[in-house]
């Protein structure tokens, strides 16, 4: 069965007994998938133009439904950064953990290379493209959060590397 819809419109009542769900939802409007393309109206950034609407009608409900779809020992991992739009940081990671705190197992950092930027970002003092500046930028390594959740709180994904718990930081 092929589906062509947003994640918030999936037939969630038919999705169950999932062992592992790994998702990297769009960072609100900072990642505009399929912009200008066919069916761009299905994208969450298009449907929900304000952060609160995106969070309340897409991001958190889909996260909850994904968790609900897990089997009793299933794991859900969510890779998301706090989006920054027009200078304002939206704490989507905190909102997710706050909502799913009873199921929170921990957080890991995913090491990634820098994402490409447009050539216009890398200009020298004369306004010309500066390849050396771009190459230096692209060699940087970043860490993105992966939040881990499960219905089974006896699971310990991090027992071999644990140095503290969430409670230690509260």
PLM region descriptions:
Residues 1-9:
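Conserved SAM-binding strand-loop segment of SAM-dependent methyltransferases
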Residues 84-170:
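Class I S-adenosyl-L-methionine
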